[in-house]
């Protein structure tokens, strides 16, 4: 008997058409591989989708692929991830469950003493007992685990599988994923397999009382940093597990995605003009046809602004050479003339406000309304305005002017200013 374990597909994350195709092709390859290998069931512990209700293009694709798996007689067991979670069951996950293409495994009951108990579902073909908890927003899943009735789950007999979505502090990883991590001890002991999601690199470890704690990693990319990892040789795919009364083997199955070209430039103690020249030289004669190109510029400029490092011409040249997409990373590029001081906060909005507060003193403007407290408030409002998502059925030629006009109105400007 065997099952497949995949996670963090993040369907709908990619905005560039070329990457959207790869995103879907990789997922399609995995499900086709599961059908070909005749797995008994599939586990997906979260972040199947990048948001709880993705655009219709993504939903149509997902429904077609899950129907094919369903028609092949392979059940799919899932929990929410932190991206596709919905507290009111208002997610495409729930639509897929409603039509019977997937099964949500979390069956939780809250008790008067504050404890939360979980029921195990039994896979009808193999007899495997499956349960788990969804990933929640803002690290609230830890509160659930602290209230979890672990003893009743540990008392269950037979081959048991626990699905979870979140970071485990005991697991050594360089995934760089943000968010709180919890100790492994919050999970029930004695399960045969712990199917993890959230961490984007493959990781398989066993501990005393916890055998086979496994993250398959993302099959392609759920963040821009994943593309860079892919380019640097990170293997992507899913996990195939053979079992009888116990787990017999855990194997990583690699699924290839695309070719990459990485261009790195060290800007430390250099002027922007020098960096621009090196970029032009490094990209002049390279073959980028049908490749994802990643340009990474890091270091501290000795003079000039980070904006003076202009990649627009280089990007155009690479696109003219038929690169699939050109992804530029300048988030580790700073300047001696202006450097951003980091700040902390209890939530996203507070962090943003604190960053503005820490850094606004470096700015010099002739307009006092752009400085001090008024400048901080304006910056926060502007960031919120620029971060608005497209409305349902809104086209780009409607979305862009709407956001532009709102931003100009905040600044007290108009199109002619």
For each predicted feature, which ranges?
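Accessory, non-catalytic peripheral segments of nucleic-acid enzymes
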Residues: 245-417
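Glycine-rich phosphate-binding loop signature in dinucleotide/nucleotide-binding domains
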Residues: 34-38, 154-157, 286-288
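His/Asp/Glu-rich metal-coordinating catalytic cores
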Residues: 41, 54-67, 72-229, 233-242
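Structural beta-sheet core signal
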Residues: 5, 44, 78, 162, ...
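Short histidine/acidic/glycine/proline-rich micro-motifs that form metal-
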Residues: 48-50, 82-86, 300-302
